[in-house]
Amino acid sequence: MLHAEARSARRGMLTLEQLRVEVGEGTIDTVVLAFTDMQGRLQGKRLSAEFFLDEVIRHHAEGCNYLLAVDVEMNTVDGYAMSSWDRGYGDFVLVPALATMRRLPWHEASALVIADLAWEDGSPVVASPRQILQAQVKRLGERGWTAMAGTELEFVVYNDSYEQAQASGWRDLTPANQYNVDYSILGTGRVEPLLRKIRLGMAGAGLYVESSKGECNLGQHEIAFRYASAVTTCDNHSVYKTGAKEIAAADGMSITFMAKPNDREGNSCHIHLSLRDRASKGVLAGDGPHGLSPLGEHFLAGQLAGLRELALFHAPNVNSYKRYVPGSFAPTAVRWGVDNRTCAMRLVGHSSSSLRVENRVPGGDVNPYLAVAAMIAAGLDGIERELPLEPAFGGNAYSDPGPRVPSTLRDALAEWEKSQLARQAFGDEVVEHYANGARVELAAFDAAVTDWELRRGFERL
């Protein structure tokens, strides 16, 4: 099976020399230098392409370190060790990862480069999501293994612009479809002009587009991309998520990736993960039951054992947990099954080369770097401790009385803070940093007056 990185010169990717030529010819004049923040958003700067070539490649760029210590609203909040008023909110360094350089076809004459984050002395910013994943990938590399990943990100399309959505309080919006268009060619045809622009835009930015399809919620769709190495997939995911919103906005429409935008089916982000050795042979595949190797069984057992402890990296927001509803295709039971969509972990693949684990817990609001890092950490823990794999769950896991996916962010935070697995895999600094992020999110939610409270209490209480 050909994977994305087997094609060394994907259309849309740029080498440094190609960028120099295009800047000289005037076809590229802007370079976006960006990293992914705690919330999974691209943050950074738009640079003059000339300045990028003359200065930033050699000397890098700077950004305020509060960018990894703010809430969704970009408020400065207390509790972060690495960034605060007491520390003066200084800079960290954006180091261009030149292998990620690509065109941005939906922005005129623009290219984008993903950045790693470092301090002034060159040491990594360990709380950076990309660096967190890189650290887990390095652990795999020490064993001679490579993680291959794919993300399946769902979204809901509205005919309203983002400005119109805000003006209406994000209520009474018009979804781009008025009925369930799951696999519907007729229904998805209504939204094809936008979907095609997104597919072509992503292909022009170096992503390997496989397909698009309708989903269950009104206006809900999914665009699938070819799997690649773990870091590359997460880079692509971040580019896609931002780009899809920008392309929709240019058409006067809006897209939401939030996990549960309304009372219907939520937006998922199923993550597929497999391991390969130095000979590109699947590590998880073998002669055991369901085609698993002993290492594959331990790896999958680790996913189950660590799921509740690491749920914060799979479901980072208050809204994330409202997606876990029985019968909604979002999991509630910490079980695994063979091609069983009612389980948290689904074993899929019809050959040793395609065998992989699908994690069905993350929603569309997930930070992919953190979720994939959590899967690698849990799998390695299972391998190192040689955890036995429980039997595959057959039937409807929604009715299972066993361990459950945490039902609230507060529950997930409690599991995270007491997790030895999280501290051993990521370190105390990362654990405390993201625990504080969850506390900030919970404090904001606890202080909010909701529509539910107003509806029940305005007159009657």
Spans of model-derived segments:
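ATP/Mg2+-dependent ligation/transfer catalytic cores
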Residues: 1-211, 253, 401-461
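Catalytic-core signal marking the mid-to-C-terminal active-site face
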Residues: 2-6, 14, 26, 246-247, ...
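Conserved structured core elements
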Residues: 13, 130, 149, 192, ...
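A generic structural motif
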Residues: 37-39, 118-124, 187, 227-233, ...
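Short glycine/proline-enriched loop/turn "hinge" motifs that connect secondary-structure elements
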Residues: 102-109, 147, 212-217, 264, ...
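Histidine-centered divalent-metal-coordination microenvironment in nucleic-acid enzymes
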Residues: 154-168, 214, 218-226, 258-279
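Acidic, His- and aromatic-enriched active-site or binding-groove loops in soluble protein domains
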Residues: 170-197, 230-241, 245, 279-285, ...
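Gly/Pro-rich turn-and-neighbor structural signature
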Residues: 226, 233-239, 245-246, 252-261
